[in-house]
Amino acid sequence: MMMHELPVPIHQSPGSENHSNPASREQSKPKKETERRLPSGAKVDFGNGSGSKKQQSNQKPKKGSDSEKKKANRANSPALPNGEKPNFYNDNKEKNKKLLDPSLPNGAKPNFSFYSESNSNSNSNVSSNSNKTKKKVHEQSLPSGEKPVFHDKPNKKTSSSNRPDKNGKKGPVEETYAGSSFHSSPAALNLPKPSFQRTSPKQQANTINDENSSPSSSASSVSMSSPRPVAGAVAAPPRYPVTAYPPGSIPGAVPNVPAGYYPPQYAQPQYIQPGFTYNVNPQGYIQYQYPPFHHPLAPAQIPYQQHPFPVNAQPPAHVGSAPQGQKISFDDLLGSAKK
């Protein structure tokens, strides 16, 4: 029988299992752990056994000297590789304040204070000498010794102009803007002012007479007496154009030809239309007679005169060729097509 065909008991009582398997009882009993030792003979201690706990309980804390405590603190406290202690700024608040105060590399404290304005409500007990020394300390200066201007104080001129008078009225306010210095200059004030009012022809005549009578308008009278161009006259073209191009650069432009020079003109030959006289080959192709080719710039030649063949004459026969077909006119050809 095979192993998978062996009968397996299904119903078994719990008591029968204990009696049948004595090895299970031995497994249920706790076994004593065998002591494991190192090759040197020392016991192996992993720190998780009962023996280690007993040893820890047996060890009582001993009161050591101050030097031992310091050594323990040194061992627990962090230290840099060179032996110095790192400063985390968490010891005391007073120490932190001292350390957080800004200082220059030479140890001096920087002065971030601005101009000290004069205190109108200063105490009477403070002497004038002490106030002067304070102002000197707070005043800033450039390396050249000059005082910087931050434009954070009102100017004396503007403050004096804005102060109200005894009657409670403020003084004139001067407006400053870009170009105000030129607009207030006498050269700008003496410029003629334009008038946009519509004037009648009588007023225009009066103004013209006043200008002519005044000595200052002598230049204007001279300009008026000078001849003026008539409105209907055609203006002459400009002698020199605005854009000067080199000759020959503009296509279609007439080149600069001296006066009295005319290029030679050749007589162009007249091309005579071949007409409707033609010859018919034995193969049935029609041959037209064309005039010879003429160059347009060639010298004048005698025009080509076409000599049509007579109707009754026969074309010259070629030696050794088949006889040609009958010569017909264009009218006969059209008549045959209509039929």
From Swiss-Prot:
Pfam families according to UniProt: PNRC
GO cellular component: cytoplasm
Domain of life: Eukaryota
Comp. bias (Basic and acidic residues): 26-38, 91-100, 163-173
Region (Disordered): 1-240, 309-339
Compositionally biased residues, Low complexity: 111-131, 213-237
GO molecular function: RNA binding
Biased composition (Polar residues): 13-25, 196-212
GO BP terms, alphabetized: mRNA processing; nuclear-transcribed mRNA catabolic process, nonsense-mediated decay
Keywords for this protein: Cytoplasm, mRNA processing, Nonsense-mediated mRNA decay, RNA-binding
Role noted for this protein: mRNA-binding protein which stimulates mRNA decapping.
This protein's name: Enhancer of mRNA-decapping protein 1
